[in-house]
Amino acid sequence: MIRTMLQGKLHRVKVTQADLHYEGSCAIDQDFLDAAGILENEAIDIWNVTNGKRFSTYAIAAERGSRIISVNGAAAHCAAVGDIVIIASFVTMSDEEARRWQPNVAYFEGDNEMKRTAKAIPVQVA
């Protein structure tokens, strides 16, 4: 059996740019890509916490340390500057690998300040 698992997640980053006329993609600070283990040109899903829209694109690197999250091309219709989004990538693996897998998660606050990283999603409690 093959499973699709969360590979990396940028939790609650703020969109800093939305450029309808740029050639597609989402530009992400290279430090953020590294923290989540997301590669340039990798497929990503973006879930807009602010407006509820969900869309797919691919990651490109923005300048390291810039804190840039730039939603580009047609996807710019799905996010505005200031929106809070979650960016995720996924990986496929065997059932055996999946049972040992730990994702790369980075948590953000304020103006894209990375507060911490983790290798698991916390258990939700009642």
UniProtKB/Swiss-Prot annotation:
This is Aspartate 1-decarboxylase. GO terms for biological process: alanine biosynthetic process; pantothenate biosynthetic process. Transmembrane segments: none annotated. Its EC number is 4.1.1.11. Belongs to the PanD family. The keyword Cell inner membrane does not apply. It is an enzyme of class 4 (lyase). It comes from the Bacteria. The modification Pyruvic acid (Ser) is found at S25. GO terms for molecular function: aspartate 1-decarboxylase activity. Catalyzes the pyruvoyl-dependent decarboxylation of aspartate to produce beta-alanine. Substrate binds at T57, G73, A74, A75. The active site is at S25, Y58. It catalyses: L-aspartate + H(+) = beta-alanine + CO2. It holds the Pfam family Asp_decarbox. Heterooctamer of four alpha and four beta subunits. Its main location: cytoplasm. Pathway: Cofactor biosynthesis; (R)-pantothenate biosynthesis; beta-alanine from L-aspartate: step 1/1. Binds 1 pyruvoyl group covalently per subunit. InterPro entries: Asp_de-COase-like_dom_sf (IPR009010), Asp_decarbox (IPR003190). Its cofactor is pyruvate. Keywords: Autocatalytic cleavage, Cytoplasm, Decarboxylase, Lyase, Pantothenate biosynthesis, Pyruvate, Schiff base, Zymogen. It is found in: Cytoplasm.
